[in-house]
Regions:
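Active-site loop-to-helix "anion-binding N-cap" substructures in soluble metabolic enzymes
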Residues: 1-345
């Protein structure tokens, strides 16, 4: 899939708006960034722009402040982490409302705007809000793949108001994930877990091209409670919880492992049990180990999945870790995303 390449544009001394994914976990004790992986993925694009003497304006959100200013969701910890990661670069933190916003970013400087979701216009996909953002820049870059399934102002409307391109990590996501469904090594096995009901919405799309779908985590319980969520298809294998209700039972682990061992491509999103509890860790660990033993294309995505892989030292078992969970699944299931479509226009 061809997207506008930022290297093909003259961005020297231009004001460049970069939509980043800075929705990072914060430590409860001191409200500092606990894991800077998402910030790190934006750095190659940011550094490229700085090398062009561009004025870099970063747009991002943190959490769900519901359109209200809430210090709990301030991007100040992200600002502090950026200063730590880019010690030689002047970085400004703009906390004013956009209506009062007069950016004084100089060439080769960065300005981080406060949480976009403090304004209702972001999640409402307001044209007026997007126009205010557009007035701050000459060019737009999407480096927030993980949010690109959202029809929000900074994702789908803003790129329609400015010349635009995909960031380096965004382009990498599309290239790697496209290879999984354009010419897949079969059988293709999708593993869905965790607790988010949203994952069930991608099943119809996957059924058009994958060979098996294994459903674990808390999702089987959700389906049992809401029969309208159930999709009957011979490609789908439903997990069963153990008596402790914290993990899959041994029979399910054996069934899932048997299917996975035959896979040519594996797509994994969501832990199989409640990994925060010691009694809920067995299935995720075993299935991760089985995946690691295979000569298959192994793709995982989502914060909870990455946390599980990290916890059990299984990150090296995967060929690619996507920054997106739901975005990855929606792209693989349906071949497109709202933010991706906006970049192609």
């Amino acid at each position: 899939m061809k997207l506008p390449d930022l290297r093909n544009f003259d961005l020297k001394e231009k004001r460049v708006l970069v939509r980043c994914d800075f929705d990072v976990p914060l430590s409860e004790s001191d409200r500092k960034v606990a894991d800077d992986t998402r910030i790190q993925t934006s750095l190659p694009t940011i550094q490229f722009l700085l090398n062009q003497n561009a004025k870099v304006i970063l747009l991002a959100h943190l959490g769900r402040p519901e359109g209200q200013v809430n210090e709990e969701f301030s991007l100040k910890p992200v600002f502090e982490k950026l200063q730590e990661l880019l010690p030689r670069t002047k970085i400004n933190f703009q906390i004013n409302e956009l209506s009062n916003c007069e950016l004084k970013t100089e060439d080769n400087e960065i300005t981080l705007l406060e949480n976009l979701r403090f304004n209702k216009g972001e999640e409402e996909n307001s044209l007026e809000f997007a126009q205010k953002l557009a007035s701050l820049g000459d060019f737009y870059i999407n480096e927030a793949f993980a949010v690109s399934h959202r029809e929000h102002a900074s994702i789908v409307t803003l790129p329609r108001l400015l010349p635009h391109a995909a960031g380096f990590n965004f382009q990498k996501e599309i290239t790697v994930l496209s290879s999984a469904f354009e010419n897949p090594k079969r059988p293709v096995v999708v593993i869905l877990g965790g607790v988010k009901e949203d994952k069930l919405k991608v099943i119809p799309g996957f059924l058009t091209w994958v060979d098996r779908i294994l459903i674990g985590g808390y999702l089987p319980v959700l389906i049992n409670k809401q029969p309208n969520l159930a999709i009957k298809d011979p490609k789908i294998e439903m997990g069963t919880l153990a008596e402790n209700k914290l993990d899959l039972d041994l029979g399910t682990i054996e069934r899932f492992s048997s299917v996975i061992q035959k896979a040519g491509t594996i797509i994994w999103a969501g832990p199989m049990g409640k990994i925060e509890d010691e009694e809920g860790q067995n299935s995720t660990r075993i299935i991760g180990q089985v995946i690691g033993s295979l000569n298959a294309l192994r793709i995982a995505g989502g914060g909870d999945t990455e946390a599980a892989l990290t916890k059990f030292n299984l990150l090296a078992n995967m060929d690619y870790i996507s920054t997106g969970g739901t975005a990855m699944l929606e792209f693989l299931a349906n071949g497109d995303l709202p933010g991706l479509a906006a970049l192609r226009e």
